[in-house]
UniProtKB/Swiss-Prot annotation:
CDD domains hit by this protein: DnaJ
Cellular component aspect of the GO annotation: host cell cytoplasm; host cell nucleus
Domain of life: Viruses
Organism lineage: Viruses, Monodnaviria, Shotokuvirae, Cossaviricota, Papovaviricetes
Zinc finger (H1C3-type) residue numbers: 120-141
Role: Promotes efficient viral genome replication by modulating several host signaling pathways including transport network, interferon production or cell cycle progression. Inhibits host PP2A phosphatase activity and thereby prevents agnoprotein dephosphorylation. Inactivation of PP2A also results in the transactivation of cyclin A and cyclin D1 promoters. In addition, antagonizes the RIGI-mediated IFN response through interaction with E3 ligase TRIM25 leading to the inhibition of 'Lys-63'-linked ubiquitination of RIGI.
One GO process term, biological-process aspect: symbiont-mediated suppression of host cytoplasmic pattern recognition receptor signaling pathway via inhibition of RIG-I activity
Location in or out of the cell: Host cytoplasm; Host nucleus
UniProt free text on domains: The common region of ST and LT proteins comprises the J domain. This domain is essential for multiple viral activities, including virion assembly, viral DNA replication, transformation and transcriptional activation. This domain is also required for cyclin A-transactivating activity of ST.
SUPFAM superfamilies with a match to the protein in the record: Chaperone J-domain, T-antigen specific domain-like
Zn finger spans (C4-type): 101-114
Identification of the protein by name: Small t antigen
Keyword Phosphoprotein: yes
Length: 172
């Protein structure tokens, strides 16, 4: 996510969206702010045309960069996306046993927290640069990116963001 726009462009986009810069990377929040600002800045509604054009350019560049970086087969379906082996209880979908899954993920646990953390460990050996939020959706990358402690409140925020994220983006 930190390579989609340069630092100046990302700060400018967050300012245009009216969001705190700490929200950078929270795509659902950025999308809602973008749609709201489109209504405010639209020239037909008395808004600033130049700001609207710049915001559209930066947002589309960010959106396209995320698609290219994280969805090389954008628009196609993978067989792993059609069905899943999660337990039927939605409470255990994200984290089966708090805080055990957060501190010591298990290969035998079907929760997203364990699967994403184990996937993170495997992927970090294949890359020369460190994994960051949006490259990796694990709870640790989320906490590091947004500066959260290991708390249930952070867990609930992570669950909310994952709930708004398409399954294919998780790269499981």
């Amino acid at each position: 996510m930190d390579k989609v726009l340069n630092r100046e462009e990302s700060m400018e986009l967050m300012d245009l969206l009216g969001l705190d810069r700490s929200a950078w990377g929270n795509i659902p929040v950025m999308r809602k702010a973008y749609l709201k600002k489109c209504k405010e800045l639209h020239p037909d509604k008395g808004g600033d045309e130049d700001k609207m054009k710049r915001m559209n350019f930066l947002y589309k560049k960010m959106e396209q960069g995320v698609k290219v970086a994280h969805q090389p087969d954008f628009g196609t379906w993978n067989s792993s996306e059609v069905g899943c082996d999660f337990p039927p209880n939605s409470d255990t979908l994200y984290c089966k046993e708090w805080p055990n899954c957060a501190t010591n993920p298990s290969v035998h646990c079907p929760c997203l927290m364990c699967m994403l953390k184990l996937r993170h460990r495997n992927r970090k050996f294949l890359r020369s640069s460190p994994l960051v939020w949006i490259d990796c959706y694990c709870f640790d990358c989320f906490r590091q990116w947004f500066g959260c402690d290991l708390t249930q409140e952070a867990l609930h925020c992570w669950e909310k963001v994952l709930g708004d994220t398409p399954y294919r983006d998780l790269k499981l």
